[in-house]
């Protein structure tokens, strides 16, 4: 799909994978969740799970950006990468054994331009052992927020401000996958909880990725109704 008002230089989004960390594969959800963002003559791959080990090189990304260190998001880099890899300090700490040589740090709430595309990391609640971030991604007149794993966004209003698309967590549609470990929460917010965030912050389109199974029209019928100002897409 393409974004932006400039038809001569649009931002292109390619969903390379939409599957979560589960054994079940379907035709639509075959590879671990990953998004390729292309702008001008460069492409940045967001996340590179174990499914992509030995395969992602054929995509020739100019850079890779990681949301967190879980196997389905980062273990495709176990043997290294032929391009720069950007991640938070907490993620690099968990990936100490990965053979990535060209490592770069992304600081939370500090916009960073990578291959002409601006990435701003926002802390999200998801895991204690592998702390995660979501990314506000912008280039030209296009802006999206990508967060395949989360319970909630710590600074949601700033993260979603003027975003055209919210790409969120499809691990569960309506049942909560949130658990408590000590004083911390871990797990996944249901899609049912994420849609009101988009409505409140005025995001016109929500795309759900990181699916646990094939999403049917019957399942989506049980979700809160999208308003006239918001469109829901199940990937």
Where do the model's predicted regions map?
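Short amphipathic alpha-helical segments
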Residues: 57-59, 76-79, 97-99, 158-160, ...
């Amino acid at each position: 799909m393409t974004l932006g008002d400039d038809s001569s230089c649009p931002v292109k989004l390619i969903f390379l994978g939409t599957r979560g960390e589960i054994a079940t594969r379907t035709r639509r959800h075959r590879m671990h969740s990953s998004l390729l963002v292309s702008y001008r003559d460069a492409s940045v791959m967001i996340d590179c799970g174990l499914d992509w080990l030995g395969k992602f090189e054929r995509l020739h990304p100019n850079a890779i950006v990681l949301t967190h260190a879980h196997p389905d998001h980062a273990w495709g880099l176990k043997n290294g990468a032929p391009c720069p890899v950007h991640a938070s300090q907490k993620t690099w700490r968990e990936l100490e054994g990965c053979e990535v040589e060209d490592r770069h740090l992304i600081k939370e709430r500090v916009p960073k331009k990578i291959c002409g595309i601006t990435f701003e990391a926002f802390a999200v609640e998801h895991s204690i052992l592998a702390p995660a971030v979501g990314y506000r991604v912008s280039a030209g007149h296009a802006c999206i927020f990508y967060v395949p794993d989360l319970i909630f966004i710590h600074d949601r209003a700033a993260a979603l401000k003027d975003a055209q698309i919210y790409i969120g967590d499809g691990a569960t549609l309506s049942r909560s996958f949130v658990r408590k470990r000590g004083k911390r929460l871990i797990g996944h917010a249901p899609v049912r909880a994420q849609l009101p965030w988009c409505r409140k912050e005025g995001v016109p389109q929500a795309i759900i990725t990181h699916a646990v199974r094939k999403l049917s029209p019957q399942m989506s019928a049980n979700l809160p109704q999208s308003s006239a100002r918001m469109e829901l897409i199940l990937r």
